Amino acid sequence: MDIFLVVLVLLTIIAISNIVNRFVPFIPVPLIQVALGIIAASFPQGLHFELNTELFFVLFIAPLLFNDGKRTPRAELWNLRAPILLLALGLVFATVIVGGYTIHWMIPSIPLAAAFGLAAILSPTDVVAVSALSGRVKMPKGILRLLEGEGLMNDASGLVAFKFAIAAAVTGAFSLAQAAFSFVLISAGGLLSGVVISFLIIRFRLFLRRLGMQDVTMHMLIQILTPFVIYLAAEEIGVSGILAVVAGGITHAVEQDRLESTMVKLQIVSSSTWNIILFILNGLVFVILGAQIPDVVSVIFNDTAFNNMMVIGYIIVITLTLMILRFLWVLFFWNGKWFFNKDQSIYKPGLRSTLLISVSGVRGAVTLAGSFSIPYVLSDGSPFPERNLILFLAAGVIMCTLVLATIVLPILTDKPEDNVKEKKVKLLTARRKLIKAALTAIKENMNETNKTASFAVIAEYNEKMKNLRFQQFTVKNRTKKDERKVRAQGIQAEQEELLRLIERGDIPEETADSLQERFDELEVLYTNPFKVGLSKKKLKRLMYWIFFGEQKKPEMTILNEEGLIRATRVKTAKAAIESLKKHMTEENKDVTLAVISFYNHLIFRLGHSYHEQNPSRRFENQKLEIKLRAVQAIRNEIQTLFEEREISRDMSHELRQYINDVEAAMLDGDE
């Protein structure tokens, strides 16, 4: 029961972290998850559990790296093989040597072998954290692929170096020749075992298909089990399980098209299932990381043998050492003409890109999990020297690199003046995708009962799709902000005209309330970019219709009410046109004329639609329900585009405002 409660709390924290990210999108989700994990573990009765290193690697790291190996473009990795090896192998060993001597010089109480071990476990970068952070900023494609390739390889090299350093610290014996031979054997064996085991699994799946066993559920289960089987088998024979799952992922990617091209349903189910699994695993990694930090920190802060400010200073010095070494390594080795030829296909970063690569070296879960595997005692039975301090330093460096990357990466990558045209193209493409998502949602929920209303809404969205390109040119001389301001002025003029009609007694109270409610919704949508423009009254009416059915009224009463509302709206629209003409200046002329054109179109539509159709309240409620589903589909699509890095954070905000514009237009047409 305790394990179940811990898992339930962890999953709840993941859900909360994504909700929080919607309100503070400038903070990456991993950092929020780490913070929530820290908070959950800070209370005496909070989230406390011992991190099992072996279980952590097989349960989390194996499937995550398998998926990364499967999804990372192989051709781009091959083109970047030299710089990837430079970072994943060369920089790791340089970090072990330079970092080890620096740590031992700064903290003599940590033996040199243990210092090498700490430097080794600090050398791997966290590919999960890098992917999450890069989703918030626009990184050059070459740098992103380089960081992904580095993250796939350096976990293994760092852990192998860590293993030998800790073994030397425990036993007091070390052989460089033996360590080098073992490293080659473990690495090559891991890659080879991953390829062989993956090939056998693929052949097994083909064999099942030849037997006619093409059940999607069974094949999906084999896919899910694959990374665990590869990792455990590789570790059992004494080679690198991490490199094995990476090689296994790449092997599966090579065979994927041939194996699954005829199983379209499996591809769809596989994509959806893995997205859910990866979402949960990524979140759990960072929440668990945060949950371990309070216990690690409290041990050092409560120990009178340590000066708290001094140990924090150690963390800062180690972090800066890692960053500077990474910067110099990339700068000198990349710009060395003796190393790279002038092949333009090889990405060669400048100073800015070098800084990006340096700051993107975020440490994460592998570092903390590896440090927890340090034994408590040496071979002679004495306590491992400064084990608690080593854990504290590892946790501190993880937090420093994560926070530093969060702050610095947007500064280094945000160059809006260089991407204006690209942004316009992306926004136009994204808007088309949003409308397509809405149309898909409408068609999926269409049935015999709501078919007429569905076709009506589909027609509206098709019209929007056709007008997108026209809108791109008509709004080029005005900003959306100015347009919303003028539209808000028009709504205000309509409200004033409505008050005059009420004072003269030209319209009944129920009609006035209905129109005032609509004007309030439109005003909110044009002035508040983050508020949903659905009133409580309308929502209540919709829910009543969904659960209890429509409120019966005589057909003639309904027609009279609809006709009166339309006639009144024509009057308020004409009043808005007159008001906008009076306030039109040279500065806002283009915007004002566009809004006046909108009102003229509205008047024309209101005057004709009443004679062409006799809408019932049921029909209108059906349309409202369909539109709400479509709007939600659009919001989901925006989040998907953001998570898949097709749009930036700023573009997602702009598109969410675009949703409000669409919703306002729908409410205007919902007469």
Swiss-Prot record:
<comment type="function">
    <text>Transporter involved in the efflux of sodium, potassium, lithium and rubidium.</text>
</comment>
<feature type="transmembrane region" description="Helical">
    <location>
        <begin position="46"/>
        <end position="66"/>
    </location>
</feature>
<feature type="transmembrane region" description="Helical">
    <location>
        <begin position="355"/>
        <end position="375"/>
    </location>
</feature>
<keyword id="KW-0406">Ion transport</keyword>
<dbReference type="InterPro" id="IPR018422">
    <property type="entry name" value="Cation/H_exchanger_CPA1"/>
</dbReference>
<dbReference type="Pfam" id="PF00999">
    <property type="entry name" value="Na_H_Exchanger"/>
</dbReference>
<feature type="transmembrane region" description="Helical">
    <location>
        <begin position="156"/>
        <end position="176"/>
    </location>
</feature>
<feature type="transmembrane region" description="Helical">
    <location>
        <begin position="314"/>
        <end position="334"/>
    </location>
</feature>
<dbReference type="GO" id="GO:0005886">
    <property type="term" value="C:plasma membrane"/>
</dbReference>
<dbReference type="GO" id="GO:0051453">
    <property type="term" value="P:regulation of intracellular pH"/>
</dbReference>
<dbReference type="InterPro" id="IPR002014">
    <property type="entry name" value="VHS_dom"/>
</dbReference>
<dbReference type="GO" id="GO:0035091">
    <property type="term" value="F:phosphatidylinositol binding"/>
</dbReference>
<keyword id="KW-0452">Lithium</keyword>
<keyword id="KW-0630">Potassium</keyword>
<feature type="transmembrane region" description="Helical">
    <location>
        <begin position="110"/>
        <end position="130"/>
    </location>
</feature>
<feature type="transmembrane region" description="Helical">
    <location>
        <begin position="389"/>
        <end position="409"/>
    </location>
</feature>
<keyword id="KW-0813">Transport</keyword>
<keyword id="KW-0812">Transmembrane</keyword>
<feature type="transmembrane region" description="Helical">
    <location>
        <begin position="276"/>
        <end position="296"/>
    </location>
</feature>
<feature type="transmembrane region" description="Helical">
    <location>
        <begin position="228"/>
        <end position="248"/>
    </location>
</feature>
<protein>
    <recommendedName>
        <fullName>Sodium, potassium, lithium and rubidium/H(+) antiporter</fullName>
    </recommendedName>
</protein>
<feature type="transmembrane region" description="Helical">
    <location>
        <begin position="83"/>
        <end position="103"/>
    </location>
</feature>
<dbReference type="GO" id="GO:0098719">
    <property type="term" value="P:sodium ion import across plasma membrane"/>
</dbReference>
<keyword id="KW-0633">Potassium transport</keyword>
<feature type="transmembrane region" description="Helical">
    <location>
        <begin position="182"/>
        <end position="202"/>
    </location>
</feature>
<dbReference type="InterPro" id="IPR006153">
    <property type="entry name" value="Cation/H_exchanger_TM"/>
</dbReference>
<dbReference type="GO" id="GO:0043130">
    <property type="term" value="F:ubiquitin binding"/>
</dbReference>
<dbReference type="GO" id="GO:0015386">
    <property type="term" value="F:potassium:proton antiporter activity"/>
</dbReference>
<feature type="transmembrane region" description="Helical">
    <location>
        <begin position="5"/>
        <end position="27"/>
    </location>
</feature>
<keyword id="KW-1133">Transmembrane helix</keyword>
<keyword id="KW-0739">Sodium transport</keyword>
<keyword id="KW-1003">Cell membrane</keyword>
<dbReference type="GO" id="GO:0015385">
    <property type="term" value="F:sodium:proton antiporter activity"/>
</dbReference>
<dbReference type="InterPro" id="IPR004705">
    <property type="entry name" value="Cation/H_exchanger_CPA1_bac"/>
</dbReference>
<keyword id="KW-0472">Membrane</keyword>
<comment type="similarity">
    <text>Belongs to the monovalent cation:proton antiporter 1 (CPA1) transporter (TC 2.A.36) family. Nhak (TC 2.A.36.3.2) subfamily.</text>
</comment>
<keyword id="KW-0915">Sodium</keyword>
